[in-house]
C-alpha cells in the first residue's frame, strides 16, 4: 500500500516541530499538505505517492544543474568513498578556495562554512571586530539567515532601531541593527549622515529573493558603496542566492559593485551543506588563527560537500551556460506574462539569470511595501492549481523561483500550457 503525503505529514508532526525542518516547507503560507519527495532527476522530482512535478524551487536555489546531475553524483560518490569528514585541511578545500577567488575578484581570502546563516553571522562578527563598531544596517524584506542580529524588523521610523522579529532574540541585540527600506537612497543617506561613525557594516542582497524577487537599483547599490567607503564601514553583499546563479561573476559582476565582504552559499555546495564568506585581505586576516575574531566549524570544508561544489562550479563555467540559463528563465517569465494577459489576469514577472519572480500585481515590485500589496490569495490559488497540473512553484508568494540547466523547451512549454489552463479559470 502506497503511503501518502498526508500520512507522512501527520507522523512528522509527532517528532519534528510543525512536521518540517524549515518553516516554509510546512505550506503554512499557501495552505494544504506539504509534499514529501523521494527522488529527483533533471528538472523533475517525484513524491512518495509516485506523482511527478516540474521543479521550480531547486532545493531553494542550489540545484543549478538540476536534480542528481550524473557528474555531481559521481564526484560525491568518489569523495565519500575516501572518507566523509576529516576535520583537517584537504587539497580539495584549497582548490575550491582558489577557484572562488579566481572567479570573484573581490575575494582575496575566503573561509568555508556549512550554511548561509553561518556565513552571514560570521561576516557580521568580522565586520564588528574589524571596525570596532556595533551598529549594522539591513533592509526590510532581505533575509540573511537566522542569526539573532539579523532577525530584526523595522521600527516605527526610518532611523528607529530594530525590534526582534522572532521570540528569543534579545532586544539589546536587535537594537544594534538598523532596518531601512530596500532601494531607498534617501533613507540610507539620512542614516549615514546621523550615525555613520557608528556603523560597522551594511548587509544587502543585490537581488532580494525572500520578498519574492526584487532587484536593487544601480543607484541604490552605488550609494551604499560610496557611503560605506566615506564612513569606513564595510559593504557586505549577501550572494547566497545570487552567487553563480545570476552569472559567473555573480550579482556584483552584473552591477559592477566591489563589496568589502561577500557571502556565498547554495550553488557553491552543489546541493550539499556548504557556504563561504570572503573579501578584502586586511579584513579577512582579522579571523582566527591570524587575528582576534573567532570563527570555527567542525564540518567546515567537508570533503563531500566540496566535491559537489567543485563539480558544480566546473559545469557553470562552460561557455554559454548562463546565456542559455537566462534564455530559458526569460522564456518562462515572458510566457507566463503572456498567458496571464491573454486570460485577463493581473500578473507580472521578471528574471535575473536563473532566478525569477512572479507577482499577482500589474508591475514587478521594487520594495517590500509593494510586494506586500500583491494579491496573495490569487497566488495561493495559482500555486495549488499548478500543483495539480504537476508544476511545483515555491509554496509562498514571498519566495523567488529557480530554473536549472536541466530545464529545456519541453519543461517550459508544459508549464506554460498548464498556466494557460489555470489562468483561464481566473486564478
From Swiss-Prot:
It catalyses: (S)-4-amino-5-oxopentanoate = 5-aminolevulinate. It is found in: Cytoplasm. Pathway: Porphyrin-containing compound metabolism; protoporphyrin-IX biosynthesis; 5-aminolevulinate from L-glutamyl-tRNA(Glu): step 2/2. It comes from the Bacteria. GO terms for cellular component: cytoplasm. InterPro entries: 4pyrrol_synth_GluAld_NH2Trfase, Aminotrans_3, Aminotrans_3_PPA_site, PyrdxlP-dep_Trfase, PyrdxlP-dep_Trfase_major, PyrdxlP-dep_Trfase_small. Homodimer. This is Glutamate-1-semialdehyde 2,1-aminomutase. It is an enzyme of class 5 (isomerase). Keywords: Cytoplasm, Isomerase, Porphyrin biosynthesis, Pyridoxal phosphate. Its EC number is 5.4.3.8. Transmembrane segments: none annotated. Belongs to the class-III pyridoxal-phosphate-dependent aminotransferase family. HemL subfamily. It comes from Nitrosomonas eutropha (strain DSM 101675 / C91 / Nm57).
